[in-house]
C-alpha cells in the first residue's frame, strides 16, 4: 500500500500570507506546505484522506484515475473545502464521502447544490407535473456516515475510525489496513482509544511546532510521546505551520524513527 502526502501544512499553509520569516522565504521545496491531505493506493483502490482547498493543485500532477472514496477527519474548511473540485473524477462514477454525521451534515449544508437528489425526489413526489432536471455540472457524491470502532472497506482497503479530540471537538483518526494509522489535528486522545492502535507500525500524526502550546493542536514533543505510546516503528509528522522552522534544522531535532513529512513524499506501508 502506497501513501502519498499531498499536503502537510496547517490551515494557513506555508508560506503564510504576509510573512517574511526564513521559513516562508525558503527556496527548499520541502519548506512549502499545502493544506493537509493524503492519498492511499493499492493496485485496485485509491482513497483520499481529507479534501481541502488545495486539492486541485495537489491532484494535478498525479495520474487521472478513479477515486474510490474520501475519508473526512472533520468539518473544518482546510479539510473539506475542495470537495467540489472532485467533479472531474465523477466521470468514473459517484464518489463516496465517509465521515461522522456532524461532518457530513456540515458538508451538505455548505454545498447543498452537490446533493440535490433528495430535494428533487420530494418535489417530484408532491408535484409530479413539474418536470425537474438536475444541473448537469453537479458532482456525483454520496454521503456515508461512519462510526468509531466500526470498520468498513473501500475496495480492498479496510478502515477503522478512531476517536480523537481536536481541542474540545470530537473528530476521527483512521487505522488503515493492519499496520498504518493517520491522525491529524489532534490535541488529545482518550486513553481507551489507544487499544485500537495496537500493532500499528507506521504512524502519521500532527505536530504544529516545537514551542508555544496551542489550544487544539499538539506540539512536536506531544507527538513524539504519543508515537512512543503507540509503539510505532516509524512515525511521520504532519500539519506544521511556519513556526516548525526550516525542514533540515527541524529534522535534526527529532528521534531517528520520527520524520518530518513533506508535500509529495511517498511511503510504502
Predicted features and spans:
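Binuclear metal-dependent hydrolase catalytic cores
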Residues: 1-182, 192, 249-269
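Cap/insert and terminal regions of metallo-dependent hydrolase folds
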Residues: 188-268
Amino acid at each position: 500500500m502506497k501513501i502519498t502526502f499531498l499536503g502537510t501544512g496547517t490551515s494557513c499553509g506555508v508560506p503564510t500570507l504576509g510573512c517574511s520569516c526564513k521559513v516562508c522565504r525558503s527556496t527548499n521545496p520541502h519548506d512549502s506546505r499545502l493544506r493537509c491531505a493524503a492519498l492511499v493506493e493499492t493496485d485496485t483502490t485509491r482513497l483520499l484522506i481529507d479534501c481541502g482547498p488545495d486539492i486541485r493543485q495537489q491532484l494535478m500532477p498525479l495520474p487521472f484515475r478513479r477515486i474510490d472514496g474520501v475519508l473526512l477527519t472533520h468539518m473544518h474548511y482546510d479539510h473539506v473545502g475542495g470537495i467540489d473540485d472532485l467533479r472531474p473524477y465523477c466521470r468514473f462514477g459517484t464518489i463516496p464521502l465517509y465521515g461522522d454525521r456532524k461532518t457530513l451534515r456540515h458538508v451538505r449544508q455548505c454545498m447543498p447544490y452537490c446533493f440535490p437528489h433528495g430535494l428533487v425526489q420530494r418535489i417530484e413526489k408532491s408535484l409530479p407535473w413539474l418536470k425537474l432536471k438536475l444541473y448537469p455540472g453537479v458532482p456525483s457524491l454520496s454521503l456515508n456516515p461512519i462510526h468509531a470502532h466500526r470498520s468498513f472497506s473501500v475496495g480492498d482497503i479496510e478502515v477503522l475510525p478512531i476517536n480523537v479530540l481536536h481541542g474540545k471537538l470530537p473528530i476521527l483518526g483512521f487505522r488503515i489496513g493492519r499496520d498504518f494509522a493517520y491522525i491529524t489535528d489532534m490535541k488529545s486522545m482518550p486513553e481507551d482509544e489507544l487499544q485500537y492502535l495496537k500493532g500499528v507500525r507506521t504512524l502519521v500524526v500532527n505536530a504544529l511546532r516545537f514551542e508555544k502550546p496551542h489550544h487544539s493542536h499538539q506540539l512536536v514533543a506531544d507527538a513524539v510521546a504519543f508515537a512512543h505510546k503507540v509503539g510505532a516503528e516509524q512515525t511521520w509528522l504532519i500539519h506544521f505551520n511556519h513556526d516548525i522552522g526550516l525542514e533540515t534544522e527541524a529534522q535534526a531535532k527529532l528521534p531517528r524513527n520520527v520524520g518530518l513529512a513533506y508535500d509529495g513524499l511517498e511511503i510504502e506501508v
